[in-house]
Amino acid sequence: MKREVNLLKFYPQSKRPIDDRGNLITEQDRAIARKFDVEYFDGDRLTGYGGYNYSPRFWTDTVAHIKDFYHLDDNSKILDIGCAKGYMMHDLSLLIPGAEIKGVDVSNYAKENAIESMQDNIVVANANNLPFTDDYFDLVIAINTLHNLPLIDCKQAFREINRVTKNNSFVMNDAWRDAKGKQSMLNWNLTALTYMSCDDWEELFKEVDYKGDYYWFFAE
């Protein structure tokens, strides 16, 4: 498969200035953010979201697009890797109430503070060792997640996605196309440990035999 497709084209775009934030972030801020605890989700903007709360305006249109693109229905099994508090999972469940929707996240805080409808569907685990059987899911999604792993674990996470999905998967990772984009990404990055150009990501896909679809997050 391996299609480059922007499945988040309906997701609201941030208008925050990239370089201004980069001038303020310290390595201590990054270290705090990479714990993926309260400071990351509900602390200061320099260490994360500055308050990660549910709003239907973020995911409603995007999950409808994903549903149509992959022809999902009430018999589908869907996995969200890096699901955080389960907001996308929740909106998927509203749209496809019969689907089996699971989430994985490394953050105990995210699960403990997840939206109530999805809390029991979230497993605290690492993407490089997914606690599911082979070929279980009809769709596996990992949006802005795998790049938070060290390179060796990131590669293994792609192999795990191949293992647990029957056919379909979609990943989005930090990337750049040119030198300006690279500098903006370095300024913007808070949690990513594996980030590279689009061309280098595509070489990695070949190395791990990633079979799914993909797109990029650009710091623009």
Where in the sequence are the language-model features?
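Class I (Rossmann-like) S-adenosyl-L-methionine-dependent methyltransferase catalytic domain
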Residues: 1-70, 77-131, 149-156, 160, ...
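A conserved beta-strand element that flanks and buttresses the S-adenosyl-L-methionine
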Residues: 141
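Hydrophobic adenine-recognition pocket in adenosine-nucleotide-binding enzymes
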Residues: 145
